[in-house]
Amino acid sequence: MALWLQTAGQLYLPPSKPVARVLSTDEYVQPTNLVFHTGTDRMLIVGHPYFDIIDSGSNNITVPKCSGNQFRVMRLLFPDPNKFAMIDRAVFNPERERLVWRLEGLEIGRGGPLGIGTSGHPLFNKYGDTENPAAYPLKQNNGDDNRMDVSMDPKQMQLFIVGCKPATGEHWDIAKPCDPAPAKGSCPPIKLTQSIIQDGEMCDTGFGNANFITLQEDKSGVPLDITNEICKYPDLLKMTKDIYGDAVFFFGKREQIYSRHYFVRGGIDGDSLPDSGYYLAPQTDKPQNNLGGYSYFPTPSGSVASSDNQLFNRPYWLHRAQGANNGICWGNQLFITIVDNTRNTNLSISVYKQDAAIDNRYKYKQEDFRQYLRHTEEYEVELILRLCKVPLNPDVLAHLNVMDKNILEDWQLSFVPPPPQGIEDAYRYIMSQATMCPTDVPNTEREDPYKQYTFWTIDLQERFSNELSQFSLGKRYLYQYGLLNGRKRSASSFVTKKSKTVKRKRTK
């Protein structure tokens, strides 16, 4: 009797212990009735929209770059609730519990009018117009410089990401080639790179999320504001799939783009066009005999900016986060990543450079004026935070230790080392030259894990208040849950009396 057997291979053995399940914060975090409001001041930024202005003598930045296409990454620092002087032991038992902040709601305020800001390049690689050509382009001769002064408006983008860890971005960059290395002038291999989004980095403006420092060596393929920059795009696929959900509690995103013009690049096309199957050979005496370029590209445009589709200047209430972390601000901090180029107006400032004042007899000369560009931004953030308790039982501590051991270190919880075995040496004059060098004392302060990154750090440790009715966002929070004591018009009371009818007595 013939039997069919499966192809022999490696035997799969399941793990001896069940895989640990990631707990949601709602399973072990206990909310309290203490709710606080905090917020920032009106935060203003002024700078040049395209690049940093550097002093040639001292090599210091005199005017920083400030563009509406930059990421604003705010790192909000909260006070440690475990250091509060709370007398009521029914609310918090420091021997068995620890306090954390939970995000209930926030509002990201943006000031200023809506506006479109343009960017461009005085030497932009644009050989010809391929949208509505009137004649076939001439042959590119060696040594020609066909770069033009071109400007455009960027892709329209509104974005905010809220989490207790910084957001992750992605961009395309040059990869290390395999052996043998490609010839000089060949297209390099590229790879997708993930990195933390920092404050001041550029977002995608319509030319892709790429490292234009390495991918465009001619320095003329993109506008000035991203020529020497890395344009990043938030890696939402990775952050929303994170098992702990610390980087994204929730996010809002709106993009809008269309193609305004169609151009072709100047230069030699590196990838040869196949001879057969794509076109028929032209006549030898026609301009088409010298095949034109085919490295086509569009110029982006964000089109109309309207207040009807704004993501900012409105409250957001967090009821259920996307991941396992339902708004718990581990480390007493919150990261808010923002992009908004709908308020992207660049102020044009003209300054008369001559010593004499301008009077009625002056005749205009353009060389008498210097032109400057400045971009301004205005932000304000309001938060509603609830105080919550975390029980210090073994299951919760084991889960937190696997998730982030820094949480236990911040709570001053650690394993007790065993007592020393035997007697140890202790020198009296250990700092003198007669003895050996003292051992290095370890640093007791925990090192900041984000010290190598650039964030807009905002200290809110002294800006908390439990008087929610005194703040705009606090009033809306109380009104949402029916806790706001509003004045009601008293109802008028009317007393109705029934009149009794008197019956006449019938007489005989």
Swiss-Prot record:
Pfam families: Late_protein_L1 (PF00500). Its main location: virion. Transmembrane segments: none annotated. The keyword DNA-binding does not apply. It comes from the Viruses. Keywords: Capsid protein, Disulfide bond, Host nucleus, Host-virus interaction, Late protein, T=7 icosahedral capsid protein, Viral attachment to host cell, Viral penetration into host cytoplasm, Virion, Virus endocytosis by host, Virus entry into host cell. One of its GO terms (molecular function) is structural molecule activity. InterPro entries: Capsid_L1_Papillomavir (IPR002210), Capsid_L1_sf_Papillomavir (IPR036973), dsDNA_vir_gr_I_capsid (IPR011222). One of its GO terms (biological process) is virion attachment to host cell. The keyword Ribosomal protein does not apply. GO terms for cellular component: host cell nucleus; T=7 icosahedral viral capsid. SUPFAM superfamilies: Group I dsDNA viruses. It is found in: Virion; Host nucleus. Belongs to the papillomaviridae L1 protein family. Self-assembles into homopentamers. The capsid has an icosahedral symmetry and consists of 72 capsomers, with each capsomer being a pentamer of L1. Interacts with the minor capsid protein L2; this interaction is necessary for viral genome encapsidation. Interacts with protein E2; this interaction enhances E2-dependent replication and transcription activation. Forms an icosahedral capsid with a T=7 symmetry and a 50 nm diameter. The capsid is composed of 72 pentamers linked to each other by disulfide bonds and associated with L2 proteins. Binds to heparan sulfate proteoglycans on cell surface of basal layer keratinocytes to provide initial virion attachment. This binding mediates a conformational change in the virus capsid that facilitates efficient infection. The virion enters the host cell via endocytosis. During virus trafficking, L1 protein dissociates from the viral DNA and the genomic DNA is released to the host nucleus. This is Major capsid protein L1. The lineage of its organism: Viruses, Monodnaviria, Shotokuvirae, Cossaviricota, Papovaviricetes.
